[in-house]
Amino acid sequence: MSTNRKNDMMVYCSFCGKNQEEVQKIIAGNNAFICNECVELAQEIIREELVEEVLADLSEVPKPIELLHILNHYVIGQDRAKRALAVAVYNHYKRINFHDTREESEDVDLQKSNILMIGPTGSGKTFLAQTLAKSLNVPFAIADATALTEAGYVGEDVENILLKLLQVADFNIERAERGIIYVDEIDKIAKKSENVSITRDVSGEGVQQALLKIIEGTVASVPPQGGRKHPQQEMIQVDTKNILFIVGGAFDGIEEIVKQRLGEKVIGFGQNNKAIDENSSYMQEIIAEDIQKFGIIPELIGRLPVFAALEQLTVDDLVRILKEPRNALVKQYQTLLSYDDVELEFDDEALQEIANKAIERKTGARGLRSIIEETMLDVMFEVPSQENVKLVRITKETVDGTDKPILETA
């Protein structure tokens, strides 16, 4: 209940001592009263403490070499991309700390360096971003660029990306404003041509323009209930200037653009180096000009100054992914069966066959789990009920479906 000035009995705030005539409202509780001014003060103190906690969490950002070490525990291969990401993430949070602690007289303004990751499906783009966010203990959200539309069209507004980050941060705005957002499949909203279209491009340039605003840094109005179905809802203001955006895509066919550019240079200058070599890695040669030619607007490219190119994973890479990282799939399934007191072994040839299947299906690392699930289905179904089974051995023939796994009993 609340009391106001019409009450005959004078009531005082238990915290500041003011009476109901000196404040707008006093709220009664169990044997205590609090005025609206003390409520507002308490809220402000809580907000300040939350900001301090967020800043304290990021005050000692791991050095690039430490971030690389963390990534190496979970991500196999992609050494150049991991180095680029480690440096970019370290500099990003160092920049935030600089802005939070610098004197007003300092005129150096460190600008944000968002990241563009280019690499084939299943090469580890999402997992890299996810691992970085987890290692820094910052909120992380994933968005699919193909689901976005510009304002006024049916689809998801770009502001909903920020809503996802807020949800992960339990609507702690200060914490969300220092999070990481990964926007996947940015290549799917590339312009259909380099020429500016007179007509509206719902799934291409318009979405890129909308993304540009939040990526470069703006105060965005985020609908807490999402979408456009609740026009009367009170918006949440989120400042995106300190949110790190990592944008990724496969960019299928961009190698041809790179080859064409390098080939022209060869003709023009008489060089006969890696531009002619079909076996060279053109992904590492990508520059802003190639990305623009692919269909990404130059303004957006300018807000993504850090390029991290990921290579197609080889059979050897995939085999290592299966067994080496801390969360390797082989270790996960061994742990699952260990709860039934059963050991699980994979022959080297079996792991090679799983990797070959993933490459044939063009699914990369993300397809490994589904292949193991197919291989392990009967084992996971039958073995828990067979008390005498102590070891399961997966062979190449088990993976290709020509034979059953080898079971050893007690």
From Swiss-Prot:
<protein>
    <recommendedName>
        <fullName>ATP-dependent Clp protease ATP-binding subunit ClpX</fullName>
    </recommendedName>
</protein>
<dbReference type="GO" id="GO:0046983">
    <property type="term" value="F:protein dimerization activity"/>
</dbReference>
<dbReference type="GO" id="GO:0005524">
    <property type="term" value="F:ATP binding"/>
</dbReference>
<dbReference type="InterPro" id="IPR027417">
    <property type="entry name" value="P-loop_NTPase"/>
</dbReference>
<feature type="binding site">
    <location>
        <begin position="120"/>
        <end position="127"/>
    </location>
    <ligand>
        <name>ATP</name>
    </ligand>
</feature>
<keyword id="KW-0862">Zinc</keyword>
<dbReference type="InterPro" id="IPR050052">
    <property type="entry name" value="ATP-dep_Clp_protease_ClpX"/>
</dbReference>
<feature type="binding site">
    <location>
        <position position="13"/>
    </location>
    <ligand>
        <name>Zn(2+)</name>
    </ligand>
</feature>
<dbReference type="Pfam" id="PF10431">
    <property type="entry name" value="ClpB_D2-small"/>
</dbReference>
<keyword id="KW-0479">Metal-binding</keyword>
<dbReference type="InterPro" id="IPR010603">
    <property type="entry name" value="Znf_CppX_C4"/>
</dbReference>
<dbReference type="InterPro" id="IPR003959">
    <property type="entry name" value="ATPase_AAA_core"/>
</dbReference>
<dbReference type="GO" id="GO:0140662">
    <property type="term" value="F:ATP-dependent protein folding chaperone"/>
</dbReference>
<dbReference type="GO" id="GO:0051301">
    <property type="term" value="P:cell division"/>
</dbReference>
<keyword id="KW-0067">ATP-binding</keyword>
<feature type="binding site">
    <location>
        <position position="38"/>
    </location>
    <ligand>
        <name>Zn(2+)</name>
    </ligand>
</feature>
<dbReference type="GO" id="GO:0009376">
    <property type="term" value="C:HslUV protease complex"/>
</dbReference>
<dbReference type="InterPro" id="IPR003593">
    <property type="entry name" value="AAA+_ATPase"/>
</dbReference>
<dbReference type="InterPro" id="IPR038366">
    <property type="entry name" value="Znf_CppX_C4_sf"/>
</dbReference>
<dbReference type="InterPro" id="IPR019489">
    <property type="entry name" value="Clp_ATPase_C"/>
</dbReference>
<dbReference type="GO" id="GO:0051082">
    <property type="term" value="F:unfolded protein binding"/>
</dbReference>
<feature type="binding site">
    <location>
        <position position="35"/>
    </location>
    <ligand>
        <name>Zn(2+)</name>
    </ligand>
</feature>
<comment type="subunit">
    <text>Component of the ClpX-ClpP complex. Forms a hexameric ring that, in the presence of ATP, binds to fourteen ClpP subunits assembled into a disk-like structure with a central cavity, resembling the structure of eukaryotic proteasomes.</text>
</comment>
<dbReference type="Pfam" id="PF07724">
    <property type="entry name" value="AAA_2"/>
</dbReference>
<dbReference type="InterPro" id="IPR004487">
    <property type="entry name" value="Clp_protease_ATP-bd_su_ClpX"/>
</dbReference>
<feature type="domain" description="ClpX-type ZB">
    <location>
        <begin position="1"/>
        <end position="54"/>
    </location>
</feature>
<keyword id="KW-0143">Chaperone</keyword>
<comment type="similarity">
    <text>Belongs to the ClpX chaperone family.</text>
</comment>
<dbReference type="Pfam" id="PF06689">
    <property type="entry name" value="zf-C4_ClpX"/>
</dbReference>
<feature type="binding site">
    <location>
        <position position="16"/>
    </location>
    <ligand>
        <name>Zn(2+)</name>
    </ligand>
</feature>
<dbReference type="GO" id="GO:0051603">
    <property type="term" value="P:proteolysis involved in protein catabolic process"/>
</dbReference>
<dbReference type="GO" id="GO:0016887">
    <property type="term" value="F:ATP hydrolysis activity"/>
</dbReference>
<keyword id="KW-0547">Nucleotide-binding</keyword>
<dbReference type="GO" id="GO:0008270">
    <property type="term" value="F:zinc ion binding"/>
</dbReference>
<comment type="function">
    <text>ATP-dependent specificity component of the Clp protease. It directs the protease to specific substrates. Can perform chaperone functions in the absence of ClpP.</text>
</comment>
<dbReference type="InterPro" id="IPR046425">
    <property type="entry name" value="ClpX_bact"/>
</dbReference>
